[in-house]
């Protein structure tokens, strides 16, 4: 059985109404070729030319014209707060850790090594479960494969 294929992504704000939705974790939103299942239990094949980072609210454009909205899944995260949030953000970024930056808190994926480091420099930490939509890379949309130092 041939699956409907997606070879194009429509970014948030550049499409109107979804025919279905697929819920993906942050890590699963970085893909090139993968079989996915929608919330309505319909399978489709993502077959993109390049590995792509999808954001909450982007849409998979299927070849038959349907749009499948990408929803950020709830994930096990660590909420980071403290009197000097800028300093905490610097330490997180210095370790190339994906970080969701909000006005009064930072969110990162749970990692005991980073958690220990943040505790030692005065962060207040709390485990939470919610969607993870970290900042994209400075050199392009979404994630990159890193850079050399």
Curated annotation (Swiss-Prot):
UniProt cross-references to InterPro entries, sorted A to Z: UreE (IPR012406), UreE_C_dom (IPR007864), UreE_N (IPR004029), UreE_N_sf (IPR036118)
GO annotations of cellular component type: cytoplasm
Cell location: Cytoplasm
Matching Pfam families: UreE_C (PF05194), UreE_N (PF02814)
Signal sequence range: none
Keywords, ordered alphabetically: Chaperone, Cytoplasm, Nickel, Nickel insertion
SMART domains: UreE_N (SM00988)
Cysteine disulfide links: none
GO MF: nickel cation binding; unfolded protein binding
NCBIfam families noted in UniProt: PRK13261.2-4
Biological role stated in the UniProt entry: Involved in urease metallocenter assembly. Binds nickel. Probably functions as a nickel donor during metallocenter assembly.
HAMAP family linked: UreE
Homology family: Belongs to the UreE family.
Protein name (Swiss-Prot/TrEMBL): Urease accessory protein UreE
Species the sequence originates in: Ruegeria pomeroyi (strain ATCC 700808 / DSM 15171 / DSS-3) (Silicibacter pomeroyi)
């Amino acid at each position: 059985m041939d699956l409907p294929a997606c070879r194009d992504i429509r970014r948030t704000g550049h499409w109107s109404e979804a025919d279905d939705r697929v819920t993906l974790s942050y890590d699963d939103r970085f893909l090139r070729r993968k079989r996915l299942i929608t919330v309505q239990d319909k399978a489709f094949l993502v077959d993109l030319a390049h590995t792509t980072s999808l954001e909450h609210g982007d849409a998979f454009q299927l070849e038959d014209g349907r749009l499948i909205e990408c929803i950020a899944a709830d994930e096990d995260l660590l909420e980071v707060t403290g009197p000097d949030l800028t300093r905490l953000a610097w330490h997180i970024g210095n370790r190339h850790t994906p970080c969701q930056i909000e006005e009064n808190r930072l969110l990162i994926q749970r990692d005991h090594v980073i958690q220990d480091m943040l505790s030692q420099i005065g962060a207040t930490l709390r485990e939470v479960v919610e969607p993870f939509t970290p900042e994209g890379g400075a050199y392009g949309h979404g994630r990159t494969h890193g850079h050399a130092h």
